Amino acid sequence: MDELTDVYNELIMEHSMNSYNKKKLENADYCEVGHNPNCGDEITLQLKLNGNKIEDMAFSGHGCAISQASTSIMIDTLKGKTVEEAKEIIKTFIEMIKRETTDEEELKKLEDAIAFKNVSNMPARVKCALLAWHTIEDMLNKNDSTGTGNINCCH
């Protein structure tokens, strides 16, 4: 198990240092700002849809290694998924962090985001890990409730 924890730690560090998905998206359909007042983490998520599929995502902002890595890995996990699939993955991630689900079969859909499983043991870091996930959840829920297709557009 220690070996797996090491792999997860390496993945988190790699994403926090390299921020593969930290960029500006041209022609984003949606944009949402997330802020964690407890530690000052702040992100802006951008989303590009192709029909009902997440074509691309990106983020900008600043924060601790956990929030930055969680955002980057979330983007990798959700790209290419339908909005419905993304909502299911988001729900599972939040439940994992809050210790509401431990079903290994259910957690498999998280792909690399499962690396944050042990964050639930660090109460001060839970909000950091969840920031991007709550932000994208808010963005997708706003889109559903209004149906305008142009919520908080970044253009």
Language-model-detected regions and their locations in the chain:
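Domain-level signature for proteins that mediate thiol-based redox and metal-cofactor handling
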Residues: 1-155
